[in-house]
A protein has these predicted regions:
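N-terminal secretory signal peptides and thylakoid transit peptides that target proteins
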Residues: 1-15
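Bacterial Sec-dependent signal peptides at the C-terminal "C-region" and cleavage site
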Residues: 19-29
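Beta-strand-dominated extracellular/periplasmic modules and repeats
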Residues: 27-167
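Extracellular beta-sheet/turn segments enriched in Thr/Pro/Gly and aliphatic residues
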Residues: 53-58, 163-202
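Beta-strand secondary-structure signal
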Residues: 66-68, 118, 140, 192-194, ...
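Well-ordered beta-strand positions in beta-sheet-rich domains
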Residues: 82-84, 106-108, 116-118, 152-154, ...
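Short proline/glycine-enriched turn/loop segments at secondary-structure junctions
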Residues: 130-131, 180-187, 267-269
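Peripheral terminal and inter-domain segments
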Residues: 196-298
Length: 298
């Protein structure tokens, strides 16, 4: 994957782009109608990145940039201390480090008592995903805070001509995540992204679209399941219409309203090949656990 275009931006100031919507006064304080959406973890996420917020590598090409922001509670005002923030992105050639022990351009940090976090790294670049389409430059973030659903998201940058052609970046829900870039006097850049955590996240429309389709049982090619989107939710097709599944975080959907002791969970994994693997775990009424693995080819 090759670098296609460097981001050029002449913004005069950094703007804090928050992942929440309208603020309203409840008679005592301002509270937020927190509009937060999440993505499914893509093929380039690696757990266990080291605790480090300086990801820049000496001698490597790239434009230096600082990403900073504030993590807040559900009320959109109270800082959240010790939220875990994981950042990962490609290098200046559009390549991700998916296996080396160095965890290049990958790091973890924690918010302080004021909810503040920051990373110093390089500006990622657009890259060819392999089929001729170009993904706009972006940061990947995963934010984990006790009491809330983990937030997985992607941050884009104003001025990137590839945004309008990308189904994820061009989504109306992504507008708050297209960040203005401040050019600092020392020649580096800065972007700001604030987040308010919520208990239940809405999955991006484009993400639901990616998960829909027919999945074939890996152990028995004669069996398959089909998923479709309705009212921006994921449904499994049946002989009448379908069964709706709720997103519960960490790439997992669950069928709601199951009796105690019973469950049906869907875990999606987007593979580097572009294929999507689905693991279905369920417990039936006789307390027997079942696991079936399916695959949807690209």
């Amino acid at each position: 994957m090759q670098r296609r275009t460097f981001i050029k931006n002449t913004a005069l100031s950094a703007v804090a782009v928050s992942a929440f919507g309208f603020i309203e006064f409840d008679g005592k304080k301002y509270t937020g109608d927190c509009e937060t959406t999440t993505d499914i973890l893509g093929p380039f996420y690696r757990p266990g990145s080291p605790v480090q917020n300086n990801l820049a590598i000496k001698g490597e090409p790239g434009e230096f940039i600082e990403l900073s922001g504030i993590i807040r509670h559900r009320d959109c005002t109270t800082p959240y201390q010790k939220a875990k923030i994981e950042l990962w992105h490609c290098d200046a050639k559009g390549v991700y480090d998916n296996s080396s022990p160095d965890f290049r351009y990958r790091g973890t940090t924690y918010s302080d008592e004021k909810g503040h976090y920051s990373f110093n790294t390089i500006l990622p670049v657009p890259y060819d995903v392999g089929d001729g389409s170009i993904r706009p430059a972006h940061f990947h973030l995963m934010i984990t805070a006790e009491g809330y659903q983990p937030l997985v998201t992607q941050l884009y940058f104003t001025g990137d001509v590839n945004i309008k052609k990308d189904v994820y970046a061009a989504s109306p829900k992504a507008k708050r995540r297209i960040l203005n870039v401040q050019n600092l006097n020392n020649g580096t850049k800065k972007v700001v992204y604030d987040v308010s955590m919520v208990e239940n996240l809405t999955v991006e429309t484009a993400t639901i679209d990616k998960l829909t389709g027919i999945y074939t049982d890996k152990a028995d090619k004669t069996k398959s399941v089909e998923f479709f989107k309705s009212d921006n939710a994921l449904w499994r097709k049946n002989e009448v219409f379908g069964a709706k599944f709720d997103y519960t975080g960490n790439n997992t959907f669950e069928y709601p309203g199951m009796p105690p002791g019973m469950y049906r969970k869907l875990y999606f994994e987007i593979l580097v090949s572009g294929n999507i693997q689905l693991t279905v775990d369920y417990m039936n009424s006789n307390a027997t656990k079942h696991t079936v693995v399916y695959l949807k080819e690209k």
